[in-house]
Amino acid sequence: VASNLADIAAMGAKPTVLVIAMVVPKTTKISWLEAFADGLQAACDQLSPGAAIVGGDLASGDQVVISVTVHGQLEGLNPVLRSGAKVGDVVAVCGPLGKAACGLALLQSGNQDLIRSYDDWVKAQLKPSPPIDQGVAANQAGATAMLDVSDGLVRDLGRIAKASSVTLEIDRSQLSGYEAMLDLPAQSLGVDTLSWVLQGGEDHSLLATFPASATLPRSFKIIGKVVAKAAHDVLLDGQPVADAGWDSIAGN
């Protein structure tokens, strides 16, 4: 639910209704289905109050398959696409960077002591909480391009850059706050915090570009700028940066 709601928010819209299609084995207990439905609605109530599940489809099969479709309202605004970034715009983020990747690393470590100690980071992976209401706020503030960070900051920056025929340059010093939030678990796991910030996905934070003259919503933090198209889509302090984010098609 969270990732689908974030997709609507990233268009600058307000999520309104959800349609759920499910395939479940014939042995599935009604109590499980009821609990699952309650969980879906609880997620809506928490992340996007007013959004409701209005229908869907249910079929039987060998394994559980779930498809979620979210519809939204632009409330008179234009949709914010990936293709509108302009040279001179600022690049800004609303929400954490690298926190979900940190949680995944903790889970993959299998170290139960660490998993318990850093429960907040683990929850970021298992139960993300994107800033859904800030999508409309960004649209109202004049966002020129936007998406949610689902596959890694660098990869998603690159998507805006390609769609807009520009290059996005990030200021490393503006990432220090995100890195600081990851310091303790990173030390425990022996991981470089910057790799999580740049390449970790599934935070579903909002990544947007705005005119330099725009008054950004308070929740957005400027991390860089849009420059003329160069040989590389994304730069970090003027240097090319490796893209090692998630590829949904390749599955890696």
Predicted regions and their residues:
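Active-site cofactor/substrate anionic-group-binding motifs, chiefly glycine-
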Residues: 1-11
